[in-house]
């Protein structure tokens, strides 16, 4: 049973409800969940907030393509990709990637693949607030390097 939930939203997400949905089918043997949060320190500065913007049509298409690629590589059952936008504060959850499969290896690898591609290919723009003011966050070379293992 291949199903996916892809959401971009301002509201917080319910990890427990998502886990329940991911692991519901009796054929599921493994469920992985990654949750990314707003950290208090970035690039050597204290961060008090993060504002995320996106272009809805582009974002949904990019996320769907990432999920499709994961499904082509591994035998997966359910996938959840939920990304928040708008104003977030230190400690807030930004993103959840959840994958269920019959086997743990597929679930682990697909989750990492989706997150690596989401970080570099999904059109989200981040603006951090620090004591020195606001700044736009550019993609990191280390994030791009993570993609090499999937090529």
Swiss-Prot record:
The entry describes its oligomerization and partners as: Heterotetramer of 2 MoaD subunits and 2 MoaE subunits. Also stable as homodimer. The enzyme changes between these two forms during catalysis.
The gene from which this protein is expressed is moaE
InterPro entries xref list: MoaE_sf, Mopterin_biosynth_MoaE
Gene Ontology molecular function terms on file: molybdopterin synthase activity
Q: In which pathway does it act?
A: Cofactor biosynthesis; molybdopterin biosynthesis
Give EC number(s), comma-separated: 2.8.1.12
Kind of enzyme, top EC level?
transferase
Query: Which CDD domains does the protein's record reference?
Result: MoaE (cd00756)
Kindly state which reaction or reactions the protein catalyses. 2 [molybdopterin-synthase sulfur-carrier protein]-C-terminal-Gly-aminoethanethioate + cyclic pyranopterin phosphate + H2O = molybdopterin + 2 [molybdopterin-synthase sulfur-carrier protein]-C-terminal Gly-Gly + 2 H(+)
How is this protein named in the record?
Molybdopterin synthase catalytic subunit
Key words, A-Z: Molybdenum cofactor biosynthesis, Transferase
A biological process (GO) annotation for this entry?
Mo-molybdopterin cofactor biosynthetic process
Q: Name one Pfam family in it.
A: MoaE
Taxonomic lineage is: Bacteria, Pseudomonadati, Pseudomonadota, Gammaproteobacteria, Pasteurellales
What this protein is reported to do is described as:
Converts molybdopterin precursor Z into molybdopterin. This requires the incorporation of two sulfur atoms into precursor Z to generate a dithiolene group. The sulfur is provided by MoaD.
User: Where is substrate annotated to bind?
Assistant: 37-39, 103-104, 119, 126-128
> Which family is annotated?
Belongs to the MoaE family.
